[in-house]
Structures are given as structure tokens and as C-alpha cells.
Amino acid sequence: MRAIFLVDNGSLRAQATLNLRRVATSLSGLVGETVQAASLLHSNKIPADEVGGIPATTLGPAVERCAEQGATEIIVLPFFFGPSKALTGYLPERMATLQERFPHVKVRVAQPLVDEFGDNDLRLAHLLADNVRDKLRPGTKPHVALVDHGSPIPEVTAV
């Protein structure tokens, strides 16, 4: 049995969890398998009534539940622009803890949304360009700023 998780950093804002769930549901339809939404941290503190009555979950307890229910493979899909410390530090530590308890469970972690060392994948740029075009007013020349959360890690900001 396999369990697939779309994972973000986590937030105390309900809208962030609802958005992650929306994307996971859409992804489930595209890949033909259930993709579960989970955050690395924080989201489990959001009151359930703010996220549709279904408590938000963090990845650690979610993967342990799946392993207890017989999962032998965990696939983690990072919903991150680049290799933040959450992906290079916390996530491997958390998955190592899982594998200490469930050594038969194989864990695979996909690349973040942008892999600066891989081929130039411009799908995200095309998606953003489509979003800009949707907001254009005829006859105007927009000025566009692309802003993210930011990071002190050069590998993350390089993307």
C-alpha cells in the first residue's frame, strides 16, 4: 500500500490549509490516486471548525498513521519553491524517526517545485504568466513583481 502526501511548510492560517487541500484534491484527480494534504508544522493548531470541520494534519503523525494501517511506501511531494531547511533538515529527521519505528516503510521525497540544478522547467513561469494575463486591463502595460516568502538560504532564493 502506498500513501502520497502533498506537503507545505504549514501555517496557522486556515486558508493555507484549505488551499493545500484543494491542490491535493486536484492532484489526486490528475494522477488517479489519493494525494493527502499535510503540513510539516503548525497547521494542526488551527481549530477544526475553521477548516471545514476536518482537523488539519501534520506530516509526522499522518505518515505514522499510514504505516500503522499497512502502508509500505510513503511519497512526499514538497509544495515548496526550493530546498528550504524544512526540506533539508526537518523532513529527513522526521522520516528517519518514522523508519526507526517502521523500517519496512520506504520513503521517497520528490524535488521541490523548482530544481535549480535540473533542466529549466518553465511550467511554473507559464502558469504565473497566465495568471498575469487574466488580470490585465486592455491597453495597459503592467509592471509585475513576483514575491515569495523569502529565505536566508541561497539555494532557496536562487530559484
Where are these regions (language model features)?
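Active-site-proximal alpha-helix that buttresses catalytic centers in soluble enzyme cores
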Residues: M1-V159
